[in-house]
Amino acid sequence: MTFSSKSPSRDNAIMMPASLGETLLREFNHLGGREILERILGEPDPRKVVEALPAGDFFWLVKKIGDDDCLPVLELATPDQWQYLLDLEIWDRDEINPAEALAWLRRLFEANRPRTVEWLLDEGSALLYRVFQTGLEVLVREEDNKEFEIPEGFFTHDGVLYLQSRDAEAEPFLRVLTGAIAAASQAAYQTLISGLASTVPSEMEEGMYRMRTVRLAEYGFLPFEEALSIYSPLSPDQLKRGGRPDTVDVSAAGEPEALVPFLPLHEAGNAGALRGALSRITDPLVLDRIRLEFAGLANQVASVQGLSRMELDSLVGMARRPPATSTSRWRK
């Protein structure tokens, strides 16, 4: 198989990371999380640096910096980067982990309160419903009920809807979060809280899981049964190349820049035959296409291993597994 580019001179949608972003990613193994954070924040326009990172590489940076130390980076991130992070961090297979969901909402809220509230009332509304269904008990005071007594432990932001956290440790954050939502839009707040009782949790979570599956499939994360195909052995006949190799267009017009991760191939290509092969590639479009395809393979491996809260060591291991997997498939 050979690669070609239709228009090497024109701007292409798949590009290398921004200059500082590229430097940080190339030095990823040699920099500590604190140093990466300081370099980003020391830039004249740190938001531009973070927004230019592919979602997958952004996730790696968050894990390198640390979940509780990454708030400055979360503040600079795009909604798509937030969503990618949540899709990988708050799910246990096909179910949302309430504690993890609340923990990451707290981090986003602390990083950028106005943007988090705006996002939760729009793209993240389903997650907000699910978190509140799990975490809150709601009482409604009728307008003509003048003898209504506020039960102990309940609080209100409007004198009509009274809330209580089911988890005492989560109560301070849920009180602040619901207050921020009420302050942003009283109508949206009342609609949200009033609708909790009429929403079927299992149906909502099933819909959220379907949407998550679609989003992650764009990055190569496949359902478990499909992902298993990466371990299927290849016969010698499948590896034979007869005649002229096919030419593959790598101009990739219309491909979002954010879909081209840098780190998976960088981690896997530091040694061995793969490193030698990559060193001979000079066309940046070809290299970007290989990055994209390789990241998909690494994410396919991750789909088999499970996607629940992967840490940095696991990410590195999964990135280095596709070359070994390819070798073992051939040997079989």
Which stretches of residues belong to each language-model region?
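General marker for long, soluble alpha-helical cores
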Residues: 1-76, 80-332
